[in-house]
UniProtKB/Swiss-Prot annotation:
Protein name according to UniProt: Mitochondrial amidoxime reducing component 2
Provenance organism: Macaca fascicularis
Keywords for this protein: Acetylation, Isopeptide bond, Membrane, Mitochondrion, Mitochondrion outer membrane, Molybdenum, Oxidoreductase, Peroxisome, Transit peptide, Ubl conjugation
Cross-referenced PANTHER family: MITOCHONDRIAL AMIDOXIME REDUCING COMPONENT 2, MOLYBDOPTERIN COFACTOR SULFURASE MOSC
Location of the protein in the cell: Mitochondrion outer membrane; Peroxisome
Length: 335
């Protein structure tokens, strides 16, 4: 040990031979302090965020088949790809043409009359004037894998068999259709391809563009004060309905905490002709509620490139933290 080092240790009251052990303890202590400081700084922004209650969960809906009836649930798991209750997953089933192109209530309005329930590990489909269709909740891996086309993007789907195909073909009575199922090992449609100008990074199966759609009952009440034929929430097909807030207050919500789930706003929901399909009759109107919504719910001119001339009603969200939620949960805005 050099003279300068020995004198420094002596000033601390330590013998020269204690240096290796003392320095090891000191280094470990400093490392622990540094790691603790980094962890604290990373956690600090989250701890600092204020929670402002903006409403309460009034309803939760899962739509097992795209464009078919929703299933109301009292609680649900919120996965990165949307709501789940047991083996019911949101929009993990899809009706397609023989060439793989998507079929929705925009083309076949009577799809909204098809209901789905889950019993004994089976999906049960019902529709007017049809015998019920019973399918296993998971399709055999030996079934054909289809290349499906949804709004210009490709995605896989496992065929649900000839019985399901015949059932939907007989019910819709226009052309041959097939039913396919998304599997969790398949690659979803990515946000980078769906909405390349936006920040979030997520995947969806067969929804239009997001894992979640949130609406408020106050906004529907407001619409119904302006329109002759009253609309139902089923016209708009949200996953989460919030009560206890003002009409269109949801326009101002960015990040929300619901139950143990954190979600982040993607964009407002631009509405299309599907909202004009009567959920009770399967008859398409093609005018309302779109005409009324266009009179007061168009986007700001600065956002015209994104939304075009579609009226905005409801908000699309991505799932930032998975968890569970239930009817009655408070909805907090994270500010």
């Amino acid at each position: 040990m050099g003279a300068s080092s020995s004198s420094a240790l002596a000033r601390l009251g330590l013998p020269a031979q204690a240096r290796p052990r003392w320095l090891g303890v000191a280094v470990l202590g400093l490392a622990a302090v540094a790691l603790g400081a980094v962890a604290w700084r990373r956690a600090w922004p989250r701890r600092r965020r204020r929670l402002q209650q903006v409403g309460t969960v009034a309803k939760l809906w899962i739509y097992p088949v795209k464009s078919c009836k929703g299933v109301p649930v009292s609680e649900a798991e919120c996965t990165a790809m949307g709501l789940r209750s047991g083996n019911l997953r949101d929009r993990f089933l899809l009706v397609i043409k023989e060439d793989g192109h998507i079929v929705t209530a925009r083309q076949e309005p009577r799809l909204v009359l098809v209901s789905i329930t889950y019993e004994n590990n089976c999906l049960i489909f019902k529709a007017p004037d049809m015998d019920q269709l019973v399918l296993p909740s998971k399709q055999p891996s030996s079934n054909k894998l289809h290349n499906c086309r949804i709004f210009g993007l490709d995605i896989k789907g496992r065929d649900c068999g000839n019985e399901a195909a015949q059932w939907f073909t007989n019910f819709l009575k226009t052309e041959v259709y097939r039913l396919v199922q998304f599997e969790t090992n398949m690659k979803g449609r990515t946000s980078r391809k769906l909405l390349p100008t936006l920040d979030q990074n997520y995947q969806v199966a067969y929804p239009d563009c997001s894992p979640l759609l949130i609406m408020t009952d106050a906004s529907l009440v407001d619409l119904n004060t302006r329109i002759e034929k009253k609309m139902k929430m089923e016209n708009f097909r949200p996953n989460i309905v919030v009560t206890g807030c003002d009409a269109f207050e949801e326009d101002t919500w960015d990040e929300l905490l619901i139950g143990s789930v954190e979600v982040k706003k993607i964009m407002a929901c631009p509405r299309c002709i599907l909202t004009t399909v009567d959920p009770d009759t399967g008859v398409i109107d093609r005018k309302e509620p779109l005409d009324t919504l266009k009179s007061y719910r168009l986007c700001d001119p600065s956002e015209r490139e994104l939304y075009k001339l579609s009226p905005l009603f409801g908000i699309y969200y991505s799932v930032e933290k998975i968890g569970s939620l239930r009817v009655g949960d408070p909805v907090y805005r994270m500010v």
